[in-house]
Regions:
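N-terminal amphipathic, basic-rich helices that act as targeting or association modules
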Residues: 1-75
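AMP-dependent adenylate-forming
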Residues: 23-29, 88-114, 224-232
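A short N-terminal helical cap/helix-turn-helix that marks the beginning
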Residues: 42, 50-64, 81-102
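Hydrophobic alpha-helical segments in the ANL/AMP-binding
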Residues: 89-93, 130, 148-168, 175-177, ...
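Conserved S/T- and glycine-rich ATP-binding loop of Class I adenylate-forming
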Residues: 140, 157, 261, 267-270
Length: 290
């Protein structure tokens, strides 16, 4: 019985095949199958990850670095020591009119941003964050949906070396506090509300609770999502997105160590308070590329 579920019609046109040829040329070793490549990769992890970086042209080869340190235990392993780069800069390397982001709401309304437009909007958000004194190591949190605006805020935060974390806007205030409150964020991006099965749900009550409860907050930025007009007169730290961003055309990026924190994600919270899980910028980038 053939257990194969699927195979490409033209294997030699796949990115996997191209990577195999690249590794073969670099290593002087012929790979006849995926299994050959797999066994080589697990026996030569340093060479494998170095070849991933070369294949995707990350530019690390121009720096003096150690791929993997000599570690007594696995937990002590440190990758690409000496490499400095910026996660957002790698993602924003293009500035053309090719679509960069496409988001669609539940009504089927589509928003598309080109790389050029995305770069411009991230630059404006970076300027807004800089104006508030955000710098490397600060935490930036969000209660936002999967929209272009959320990605813009994330990229702007990582451009400065700030650490990003977010929750879905349909979380209750307590669930959001259990997660984001642990981080002591300086900035919180919140949508004005969310929509589910055609019904709009205002976020004002949740925003008010987070505004009052997270003492580390210096600014709460409210982003349009359902075009709800919120009364924020009693929230002195709150402002709207258009009040927060500043004029800018070029992004500024801070070069950071390979393992600099990028995201904080969370465990499910089913057996207790959600636990923070930190993901580094370098590992996230090359894993996504791979």
């Amino acid at each position: 019985m053939d257990d194969r579920l699927w195979e490409p019609q033209n294997p030699q046109k796949t990115r996997m095949w191209q990577f195999m040829q690249s590794v073969s040329q670099d290593q002087g070793q012929k790979f006849d199958s995926y299994q050959d490549l797999y066994h080589w990769s697990i026996n030569n992890p340093e060479s494998f990850w170095e070849n991933i970086c070369l294949f995707f042209n990350l530019g690390f080869d121009s720096q003096d670095y150690e791929i993997l340190n000599k570690y007594p235990q696995m937990i002590d392993a440190q990758w690409f020591k000496g490499v400095h780069f910026n996660f957002a800069q790698k993602l924003l390397s293009r500035k053309d009119n090719h679509p960069a982001l496409i988001s669609i709401n539940e009504h089927g309304e589509k928003q598309s941003l080109s790389y050029k437009e995305l770069h411009h909007r991230v630059a404006q958000c970076i300027a807004g964050l800089k104006n508030l004194g955000i710098t490397s190591g600060d935490r930036v949190a969000a209660l936002m949906p999967n929209t272009a605006q959320t990605i813009i805020a994330m990229l702007a935060s990582s451009a400065l070396g700030a650490i990003w974390s977010s929750c879905s806007p349909d979380f209750g205030a307590e669930a959001a506090l259990d997660r984001l409150g642990q981080l002591e964020p300086k900035i919180l991006f919140c949508c004005d509300g969310h929509q589910y099965q055609g019904k709009k749900h205002s976020a004002l009550d949740k925003i008010s609770i987070l505004h009052e409860t997270i003492s580390s907050l210096e600014r709460v930025v409210i982003c349009p999502n359902i075009n709800e007009v919120l009364d924020i007169s009693q929230l002195p730290k709150a402002c709207y997105w258009n009040e927060f961003i500043l004029p800018a055309t070029e992004c500024s990026f801070t070069a950071l160590p390979f393992n600099h924190p990028l995201y904080v994600l969370f465990s499910s919270g089913t057996t207790g308070r959600p636990k923070c899980i930190m993901h580094g910028a370098g590992g996230t980038l090359i894993q996504h590329l791979k």
